[in-house]
Design a protein with these regions (language model features):
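Structured C-terminal cap/extension of enzyme domains
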Residues: 10-114
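Structural preference for beta-strand elements that scaffold enzyme active sites
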Residues: 3-5, 21-22
Length: 114
């Protein structure tokens, strides 16, 4: 037997629907309760409600993680949410100003910033 975990937030629900057993999540760093809510619904077999969470989390993941190589966007998001410092070590570099603005908008759209 082999256990399959999703390593891509956008594939958590699709993978779980074909037998995947969990997720190594990036967005759970900033919205752990939301990822847990979705995975709990998956485990309960309520794929209709899980799909609602998936769509919301998918937008967050897609809009955030396409800005730069991971973990730069999640680290920047966590810094914006006062969860950590914005200090990076090479080879990571800060987000460009336009991408930082896009990230702030993504976090605002999700309801994490006002």
């Amino acid at each position: 037997d082999i256990t399959i975990l999703s390593g891509d937030d956008s594939l958590t629900l699709p993978l779980a629907s074909v037998g995947g057993k969990g997720v190594i999540s990036v967005v759970a760093n900033i919205v752990p309760a939301d990822v847990k809510a979705m995975t709990d619904l998956i485990l309960e077999g309520d794929l209709v409600k899980a799909r609602q969470w998936h769509r919301k989390l998918f937008a967050l993941s897609k809009n955030m993680l396409t800005l730069a190589t991971n973990p730069i966007p999640i680290k920047a998001a966590m810094a914006m949410l006062d969860m950590c410092s914005d200090e990076l070590r090479l080879p990571m570099t800060p987000l460009e100003p336009a991408k930082k603005t896009a990230l702030k908008q993504t976090l605002t759209d999700y309801g994490l910033l006002s």
